[in-house]
Amino acid sequence: MYLLRRLKKLTVTDIISYSAFFLMYPIGILYKQYLKIRRKSFWLICEDEYGANDNGYHFFGYMCRYQKQKPVFYVLNRKSRYYEEVNKIGNVIRWGSLRHWLYYLSAQSIISTQLGSSPSLKTFFPLEIIGVLQNKRVFLQHGVLLNYYESLNYTNNKLSCIICGAKPEYEYIKSSFGFSEKAVVYTGLARFDELHDYKKQENLIIIMPTWRSWLTQNGVACEEKIKFTDSQYYKEFNGLLNNAQFIEFVEKNNLQVLFYLHRAMQQYVSSFKSRSSNITIVKRFDKDIQNLLKEASFMITDYSSVSVDFAYMKKPLIYFQFDQEKFKKYHGRKGYFSYQDNGFGPTAENVESVIEFLKKSYKNNFRLEKLYEERA
């Protein structure tokens, strides 16, 4: 069912990609055999088309600095703001280029933070699922898994290996998603290595909600199809950004607030506004997300796994969860993690509760409470 839903969304561009695949496939196989004869191999590393600030980037940097004997290549769009930075570290392949096609087909391992790292997701992914392509694919993940997602079932991705960032997550994936025991590896996340040298700004607050499948163009639709600005998601978060009590507290204490949408929701970033100059709506590539996590003193999120990164640095946060039932029904079903029993901060269903905890945390000099510190 999962694969069929993806195939139903094929476009003319996808059909062109299939044609390109059938042209490049025999060349890629021949090149792979040539490398095998020469006893050579390489790894292909990436995140998404424009990204280089997550586990893929940090793993690539580690390989280039400390494991130079192994050839690695990073795949990135030439227009990415990170392109020159990554190019200084090691070898970069332009996303979508013929070289990307060739190397994807001939790499010993494809290592990515996303399930889709090929030149054409709709071309390669079904062929990987049915076994036509049997390349080794390693999923670095882009955060610690907290909820259950259908896409992570082994039958829906045929991943060779999945990396885990936390022990409970590791045990959960081993038992619940159909992977062999050796395919699930607990190493921690590469990006966590960069969270030890943080220097926080005492007056910086970040708001980082995750996405909603029913509000994204390529997501799974639910029965409610409405204009985005009529959605509860928009009303709650935009309401927080313009709440009189919130603005008064922020301005009175000279706090700076940055609102940073998940990449899947960035299409709606222009819909959000605030009447306070202390509150800034951030576009995806205007700020580096990891730097924001390191600099901020307090976080407001909803269900996002960035809360784990924040708790890793022993910083306070709150989960603003106004749509719990709908989220569990249409986006990510409840897994091993309970936000109430295992979370790194309290949960709130309304703006007033969020503001109340923010004030409490501010009075405590943004120190993480003992209960949540023990959980972290």
Regions found by a protein language model. Give the residues of each.
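Catalytic binding pocket for nucleotide-activated donors in carbohydrate/polymer assembly enzymes
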Residues: 271-276, 303-376
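Active-site and donor-binding regions of nucleotide-sugar-utilizing enzymes
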Residues: 42-195
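Membrane-proximal basic amphipathic "stem/tether" segments
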Residues: 1-47
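Conserved catalytic-core segment of nucleotide-activated headgroup transferases in glycan assembly
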Residues: 54-60, 64, 190-271, 348
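Donor nucleotide-activated moiety binding/catalytic core segment of transferases
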Residues: 94-102, 263-308
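Short loop/turn segments at strand-loop or loop-helix junctions that form parts
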Residues: 46-47, 108, 113-115, 141-143, ...
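Short active-site oxyanion
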Residues: 69-73, 157-162, 256-257, 295-298, ...
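A short, gly/pro- and small-residue-rich
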Residues: 123-143, 224-235, 315-326
